[in-house]
Amino acid sequence: MTVSSSSSQVPVSSSHIDANGNVVMIDVSQKAPSARAATAKGFIAVSSHVVAAVRNQQMKKGDVLTVAQLAGIMGAKKTAELIPLCHPLPLTNCLVTLEVTDCGIWATCTAKTQGPTGVEMEALTGASVALCRSEERRVGKECRSRWSPYH
């Protein structure tokens, strides 16, 4: 597979593309299971009136922080259905925490499993889905991710 630019063709490699250019799922059947953990953190900017409504539990949609936590956990559990070529993983733990600041909300998702492949995508999906809950139509998003070893 190559990507064409105006001056040249650049070969592109991916672990999800075989030598014939076919899309493949990575074979992890020979990898030994091990304890795996990943943490992802994301931010959504909202207006000061939304921050006040969230803090005072006056949102029209109810307790949005609890709903966002549940949505994040459900999102992490559904990662293989949402993102192509992700292995379905039995999560052994998923924790979503939310922190309201003066300009928005931080969501942190930590996912854990015992298996042959990592849970980075589950943590990223969990944090992202938790942040999809917003009263305003126009919001800015800034996503940061960080992975940590399982202890």
Regions of interest found by a model, annotated:
Residues 2-4, 10-65, 70-87, 91-138:
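C-terminal binding/interaction regions
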Residues 140-151:
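Positively charged, low-complexity/disordered segments
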